Amino acid sequence: MFTFLVPPFRVRYADTDQMGYVYYGNYARFYEIGRVEALRSLGFSYKELEASGIMMPVYENTSRYLKPARYDNLLTVAVTIPELPRARIVFQYAIRNEAGELLHTGQTTLVFQRADTGRLCAAPQGLLDHIKPFFDQQVGKT
């Protein structure tokens, strides 16, 4: 399992609805920021992946709203990749406020797809090389 913590960020006024709560559609943006930065922390980027002819469309997205995040809250997003990617990669998210309260959880599943044919493909070896050591450590603990 690999987990990455996105640096804390403040909820901006533009992120909220009339009630001062984070607008529900913005959580998907928070997820994307987390995914991109988690992969970047591994030394892997979406830009390089796309340049190599592989895309990662979202296949499934789920969200659970436990408590509202509000304007000016300081949020942290923990991003976890719970299993070694194959033809798909799963990201799990936990969003907390500055008091550490769990406000929101979510999960996205993305698939690896060849840009030229649109067909599914295996996870790129470069990504596996970067992430596999985290899963090898887990095997050693059992």
Annotate each language-model stretch with its function.
Residues 3-7, 70-71, 81-142:
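HotDog/MaoC-like acyl-thioester-processing domains
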Residues 1-38, 44:
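Catalytic strand-loop segment that frames the active site of acyl-thioester-processing enzymes
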Residues 8-12, 64, 109:
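Generic structural detector for well-ordered beta-strands
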Residues 34, 46, 56, 134-138:
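Alpha-helix boundary/capping residues
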Residues 38-76, 80-90, 103, 111:
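Hydrophobic beta-strand-centered segment that forms part of the acyl-chain substrate-binding groove
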